[in-house]
């Protein structure tokens, strides 16, 4: 048995995290400037390698925590990327995850130390290697999941208006949503509660805030 393992090549198992945030009606990605070769100084997703004493899920949580300082964040595995020449440094198979976070709740000092920045998803710079394909796959998976489960609420603060909620889903799908139909669908949801608080950031009159009664967190 030992000869079987030793006679086969070893390779690296990497983790790449696609971190989504929502700000001022736009979907954003947290990207960083790579500080090592190959591709030093170019735009990249946050990543790392799976260690011998951790599962791929635990590795993804660690990578996310190292950048944002956050725990108990919604994360989902997207797929593996394993093209032979995908990383010019070494033979690396990368397991991709996406995470949904409140853009106002993360360790800003840690993000600055990693030279990371929030970038509008519609204005992304050129990304290294196969990272553009990773982002595309992750966004499609998020769109599919958001159509059947309330995962989008993980991108919002605890209190929000229905207009903000509609703006979020328009950003997720990249298209306008009919207000009347959207409000009708929201009214049928039993996990949204109206509060007595008024949000006046959009107008002098203000709009009633609502809250989401439970978040979809990772299992």
Short names for language-model regions:
Residues 168-175:
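Short helix-coil junctions and helix-kink-helix linkers
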Residues 11-13, 58-61, 65-105, 123, ...:
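Active-site segment of metal-dependent pyrophosphate-handling enzymes
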Residues 197-204:
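Short, Lys/Arg-rich nucleic-acid/phosphate-binding segment
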Residues 26-70, 82, 147-167:
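Conserved Nudix-box catalytic region and its N-terminal flanking loop in Nudix hydrolases
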């Amino acid at each position: 048995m030992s000869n079987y393992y030793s006679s086969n090549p070893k390779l690296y198992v990497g983790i790449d995290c696609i971190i989504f945030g929502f700000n001022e009606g736009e979907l954003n990605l947290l990207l960083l400037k790579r500080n090592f070769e190959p591709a030093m100084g170019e735009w990249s997703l946050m990543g790392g390698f799976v260690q011998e004493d951790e599962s791929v899920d635990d590795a993804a949580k660690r990578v996310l925590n190292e950048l944002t300082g956050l725990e108990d964040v919604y994360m989902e595995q997207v797929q593996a990327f394993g093209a032979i020449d995908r990383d010019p440094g070494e033979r690396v198979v990368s397991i991709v995850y996406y995470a949904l976070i409140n853009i106002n709740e993360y360790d800003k000092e840690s993000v600055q130390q990693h030279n990371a920045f929030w970038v509008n998803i519609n204005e992304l710079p050129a990304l290294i290697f196969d990272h553009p394909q990773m982002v595309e796959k992750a966004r499609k998976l998020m769109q599919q999941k958001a159509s059947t489960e309330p995962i989008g609420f993980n991108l919002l603060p605890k209190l929000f208006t229905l207009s903000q909620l509609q703006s979020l889903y328009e950003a997720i799908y990249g298209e306008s949503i009919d207000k009347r139909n959207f409000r009708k669908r929201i009214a049928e949801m039993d996990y949204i509660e109206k509060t007595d608080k008024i949000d006046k950031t959009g107008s002098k009159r203000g709009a009633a805030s609502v809250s989401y009664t439970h978040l979809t967190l990772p299992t």
